[in-house]
Amino acid sequence: MPTQAKVATVAELTDRLNRAQMLLVADYRGLTVAELNELRKKVREKGGEVIIAKNTLTRLAAREAGKTEIEEFLGGPTALAFSYDDIPGVAKAIDDFFKASKKDIKVKGGIVGTSKITGADVERVAKMPTRDESLAKILGGINAPASRIVGGLKGVMRNIAYILGAHAQKGAEG
């Protein structure tokens, strides 16, 4: 018979799985508690979270959430990274952290939307522009034509002012 704590944990995991746009399953073997906390901090800054949960409870939650694709990645010490907003930002934070740690830790795989991804796919996702970078590009694209129009209008106004000034000066002399 499952305990209330385990039932609550499965419910929390199911909720996270349902809310997440991306879930990554990683082997964290070899990381110290301080390093794991640093990883959590970096992922939290990107709008995600990293948790450690028992594989059996994660498996139950995955079945409840309809995300059974991750079951093949659940084995050994497993960290779960959830991204609720900035998929490339969280993937990049994890990828950069793992590369910088120089330990034999890796992302086993995960889910982006409804698609299963492998550890190799995570590197490609990490290279995508983050949400903020994408917004900056969009706003820059929108702003560029307006800036050119304003620049053109300033030039026209400057020319009109020059012509009126020259005409007024000519009238004063004449």
Swiss-Prot record:
Gene3D superfamilies, per this entry? Answer: 3.30.70.1730, 6.10.250.290
A single GO cellular-component term on record: large ribosomal subunit
Pfam families the UniProt entry points to: Ribosomal_L10
Give the InterPro entries listed for this entry. Answer: Ribosomal_uL10, Ribosomal_uL10-like_sf, Ribosomal_uL10_bac, Ribosomal_uL10_bac_type, Ribosomal_uL10_CS_bac
Taxonomically, the superkingdom here is Bacteria
User: What UniProt keywords are attached to this protein's entry?
Assistant: Ribonucleoprotein, Ribosomal protein, RNA-binding, rRNA-binding
Asked if the keyword Ribosomal protein belongs to this entry, the reply reads yes
Gene Ontology molecular function: any one:
structural constituent of ribosome
Single GO BP term: translation
- Give a short account of what the protein does: Forms part of the ribosomal stalk, playing a central role in the interaction of the ribosome with GTP-bound translation factors.
| SUBUNIT field | Part of the ribosomal stalk of the 50S ribosomal subunit. The N-terminus interacts with L11 and the large rRNA to form the base of the stalk. The C-terminus forms an elongated spine to which L12 dimers bind in a sequential fashion forming a multimeric L10(L12)X complex.
Supply the HAMAP family for this chain: Ribosomal_uL10 (MF_00362)
Question: What family does the Swiss-Prot or TrEMBL record give for this protein?
Answer: Belongs to the universal ribosomal protein uL10 family.
**What name does the UniProt record give this protein?**
Large ribosomal subunit protein uL10
Q: Species name for this entry?
A: Herpetosiphon aurantiacus (strain ATCC 23779 / DSM 785 / 114-95)
